[in-house]
Curated annotation (Swiss-Prot):
Coiled coil: none annotated. One of its GO terms (molecular function) is S-adenosylmethionine-dependent methyltransferase activity. GO terms for biological process: antibiotic biosynthetic process; methylation. Catalyzes the methylation of 27-O-demethylrifamycin SV (DMRSV) to rifamycin SV. Exists probably as a trimer. Gene3D superfamilies: Vaccinia Virus protein VP39. This is 27-O-demethylrifamycin SV methyltransferase.
Amino acid sequence: MTKPTPNEIGKGYDAFADLLDQLWGENLHHGYWDDESATLEEATTRLTDRLAGMLPLRAGDRLLDIGCGNGEPAIRMATANDVMVTGISISEKQVERANDRAYKADVDDRVVFEYADAMELPYPDASFDVVWALESLHHMPDRWHVIRQAARVLRPGGRLALGDFLLVPSPAGLEADAERVREVGKGVVAVVSLDEYQAHLREAGLEPESAEDVSQYTRPSWTKAAERFEGLREQALQHIEAAQFEVTLGRFRAFSEEPSLGYVLLTARKPD
């Protein structure tokens, strides 16, 4: 299945912005459940905090958020760590909403959101202390190219922080696992093993640092999303055909039962 172009992805997010907000809440990414009673909104915030906690953020650091969504993670980090954040998205509606959110949070003096394509970052070399990509790289036509772009705009000593889907090996072997995930996801989610991921980081000139497999804590996201999506059937059918609704709902449920579809939090450092 051919991956959608960045322009198609951006238009898709524009078209379904309201529905996505109802589905995921403030954060358009998975949640982290170390407490089974946590709501989806609480769990997604915990995942943001979990990845941010893997970084030595300092006041005044410049951070680039690739795939900023509605801007909540960027605003949260700016508020908690006094960093300067530039967030980018290929969804004009997300950029508009994120800037409005930053204004209302009174952080628009240090948080700005721009329309930009991560495949061709419009920033000079060595211009950021941190590049952050929380669950956005799987949308990219070539995630390894984006990582090379991230390495380019990082300053020496800067760090890349990622949250991404991971291929968790089973006795069937990686090739069989990858094929099964591809079949379930129909090209929506492409995954590789941790070893392959870290090899690509090294090829981009980055030194892998921390890697935390959080699959068991993020897996409930699929079940929660399926439950909430089912409850949004009436609203969803205003945007998509009934057949597509059932395909999407079925995919959420299939992902929740697929043991080889995992989730990893990674950091890597650009050498001095």
